[in-house]
Amino acid sequence: MGLVGFVPVANAQIVLDFSDDLANQNFFTDNPVARAAVEAAAADINAAIVFDLSAAEDITTGTAGTTSFDFDFVYNYSNPATGEQQIIEDASSPENVYRIFVGVRTLGGSALGFGGAGGTGFAGSGTLGSGSLADAVADAEANDTHRRGGGPLVITLNGAFEDGTPFSFEVGLGVGSVVFDDDANWHFDHTVPVAPGANDFYSVALHEILHTLGVGGTDSWNSMIVGTTWLGAEVIASHGTGTGIVESDGEHFAENLMSPRITDGVLQEIVLDPNLTVGTRKGLTQLDLAVLRDLGFQTNDFDPILLGDVNLDGFVNFLDISPFISVLSAGGTLAEADVNQDGAVNFLDISPFIGVLAGQ
């Protein structure tokens, strides 16, 4: 499979692959602002996660005496541009890289997007010799690299050969895919406030990329759920309880669950609940990161930025006006002055700055 449209972001952790889109709708080439929003969402997640994924080799070999057996793994995922299952014959992955295929198509209904981790399978072949097949399989299980160390357990491949010899392989993150609805009323530009009545593309990208990281349907996720109760210690420590906070669909957290945003500490509906209010934008919250820790990731610590506190006294008030003007005039990069959080301090920050001064 070619990697046309392969885009590494933020230290080559999550890597976005637009090749399926390029071969079909070519939506993201024609809509660079939408592409920038997806890349920003991936970069923000990369900044939050400490990736510790070991490299995965395509073929796992086990030996016992002169008996040798190969397990040739494959990855599969839902092609975001067509909805068809796509097979990747070479199931190898570089260290600390997780590839996500991104595309658009008409989804129907009210769905704005879908995201998820891909699947895994293998074909077995070998030569029987002086050792037992069971010992060769056990050696292959010990040698296999597809668990990848950190992150969630996506699936465990269990079974037995015709002679009854059992096998079991734990598989972590291989590839994932994200698809967006192509006819929703979207707001694409993540650097400006969301237009009234529009769905924020960045927020949906953030949500769906988290699904590819093991949220919903993976073995690690399922091990944390009993009914609507979450069992993970990190979420319980962050929220105070795990009771009644899982949505009935078993794929999300409950609607309207609130947590402090990691950038500024403001309470916000978490990214991993099932709904997005039109005309609004979400950012990662402390509870979203707690979920990722329960799924096997390490996350970075964040000191929330008080947007508008340009004089850094812990308050936003009239005393920040003169410093804000100075930073603005100098084209500075002070994070507290970048009120619209687009990575630059310029005239686009003036209206948001006035808003935070007014307590909006």
Where are these regions (language model features)?
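Sec-dependent, cleavable N-terminal signal peptides
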Residues: M1-A12
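Extracellular zinc-dependent metalloprotease catalytic-domain scaffold
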Residues: N11-L206, H211-P304
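Preference for short coil/turn "hinge" residues that link or interrupt alpha-helices
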Residues: V7, G265, T277-T280, D309, ...
